[in-house]
Design a protein with these regions (language model features):
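Small/aliphatic-rich secondary-structure junction motif
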Residues: 3-53, 136-144
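Glycine-rich, Arg-bearing micro-motifs that act as flexible, cationic patches
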Residues: 110-125
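Structural beta-alpha unit
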Residues: 1-2, 77-104
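Acidic/glycine-enriched edge-of-secondary-structure segments
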Residues: 6-13, 68-87
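A short acidic, amphipathic alpha-helical/loop segment
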Residues: 22-25, 96-97, 122
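Glycine- and acidic-residue-enriched helix-capping/strand-helix junction motifs
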Residues: 54-63
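Structural motif
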Residues: 8, 105-107
Length: 145
């Protein structure tokens, strides 16, 4: 399908939003052709979810992640990067973003398997089942934020 519109890429990350491996993936995607990027950071879990996951962030952490990561992502992308704070459940956040704004591709950035909640939840497979091309980026141990 030929189109003159740039490809809309949803970048989903939290603790890995400013890691070298994600920045490189954005740089590589930008080099493939016209595209726009939006960083989606799932917000803090609330209620019992915070008891279950003791490493959950403060209420403002998603905003802080965006403030840190967006300038670095813009540099890697060679242009403006939009940002969203999504639902605390990452798959719901991805579905909401796709349904409300429409995206053509997903770049999903996770921590290494030994510490990644998203990998334990099988988020890459679930997000891939949404029917969009998905690139999985896993941070290296030394990159962890």
């Amino acid at each position: 399908m030929a189109t003159s519109q740039p490809t809309r890429v949803l970048v989903v990350a939290h603790k890995t939003a400013a890691t070298p491996s994600l920045l490189e993936a954005v740089r590589e995607r930008a080099a493939k052709g016209p595209c726009t990027f939006t960083l989606l950071v799932p917000k803090r879990a609330h209620g019992l979810h915070t008891v279950v996951d003791a490493q959950d962030q403060s209420p403002d952490e998603a905003r802080e992640v965006i403030e840190l990561a967006v300038p670095l992502l813009e540099q890697a992308a060679g242009g403006r990067v939009e940002s969203l704070i999504g639902d605390h459940e990452p798959l719901a956040a991805i579905q909401d973003a796709i349904n409300l704004q429409g995206f053509d591709e997903i770049i999903l950035s996770t921590l290494p398997a030994r510490v990644s909640r998203w990998l334990k939840l099988d988020l890459p497979s679930k997000a891939g089942a949404l029917g969009l091309p998905l690139t999985l980026v896993t941070a290296q141990a030394r990159e962890e934020a």
